Amino acid sequence: MEFVLVLLILTVVGLIVRVVGRQVRRNRSNRPLPELPTPAFKVVALGNSGSGKTVLLASLFYQFRAKPGRPYYFDTDPATRVWLGSLLSRVVDPAEPWPTGTTRSGTRTYTFDCVTQIREAPTTAFTIEYVDYAGEIFELLGESDTALDELFERVRGADALIGVLDGRRVTQFLRGEAQGRAYVIAKIAVMVQLMAQARCAIYLVVAKWDLVHGFGEPADADDQERLDRVARALMTVDQINDLVRARTTVRLIPISAVGSAFATLDESTGQVRKRPDGTFAPYNVELPIAAIVPDLFARIRESMHDDTVRTIEDDYHARQRRTPDELVSEVGSFLLQPAGAALRASIDGVLHRPYGNELVVMMLDWIARPSRQKEVELAAFRTDVQRRTFQLWDARAVVLDDFQKQVHRLELALPASVLSR
């Protein structure tokens, strides 16, 4: 009888332990993920009226949508999401006219969250603040205007500038036509004059690349041959040549917001018309955005001494065992140490705006860039929070690695895209 009683008690205790264990595991799985410190990178898009900035914006958001096989996507607030969707609908519908350009009153800032997809829940890796300026504002340069003062301030505080060149006008310039010369030497020069006031990376994008042909290139010329000819022609313009020589990072990127089989140019009227049976297939539109963070961090890294980099790398594993909140709070004391002071000096030399500890933490993680042997790393963590935190860091590293690969592919396929580095 006593044996049966003891057995019954042990059975009950075992059931209790099992139930409690399940509840603990359930609570752990339901525990919210730690949040990544998310810095914001500031981008200003410039271009004359009719250059294609508005269509580029719609195509850009489309290209960074969530899609199978890619571990990240761009998101924004619901109102902007609906507006960009409507804008894209007007672009792709052959029965609809092209969207009108951004008016001076329509200049606005778009906030795009780069969301990484991990098993537990999506999390924001970083944010892009994208300012789309109206092309007509360049007509006011030299005048006294509050909007211009704001534009100058934003340009000087930007992490990257995207200068949109109208591919149709560039083609006219390559053909030696008067309208093309006036566009490149006068209108583009005004935009370049503004860009010269900034010290950040510059991305000159040749929009409407599907229309850039028939300017004397061989019949079988590929994108590299055409881009090389475009680059050499643009470098004959003094303002552009001076801009490139004075910058450490200037890229020339051919893009088509709609693709090569979507629209045609009516040579008699100069109008770009949609094909009734056109295929919407954007080309390279995501590359100017993908290059921003790798280029920025590479510039900071190149200005640092190797001893500082080794110190940061040596401290990497210890930092990975801290939560995101702990990392951000400890950055202040790190920046007072020799390695931290050197890093801060390098960042200050590249960024010309205030920045928070979130950016420093992301920069530290990028410099260390572990081999990411996930199983070994995850097994070394003693707590669930440490493992989940590592997964967040790793998810963001995957995004930056993908961006870097896109930049490498661009440089390999189109060496002429690198004007200055």
Where are each of the predicted segments found?
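Active-site micro-motifs of SAM-dependent methyltransferase domains
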Residues: Y62, G135, L211
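MIDAS-like acidic motif and immediate structural context at the N-terminus
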Residues: D132-A134, D166
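A short acidic, glycine/proline-enriched capping/turn motif at secondary-structure boundaries
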Residues: G135-I137, V170
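Conserved GTP-binding G-domain of TRAFAC-class P-loop NTPases and closely related GTPase folds
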Residues: G157-R319
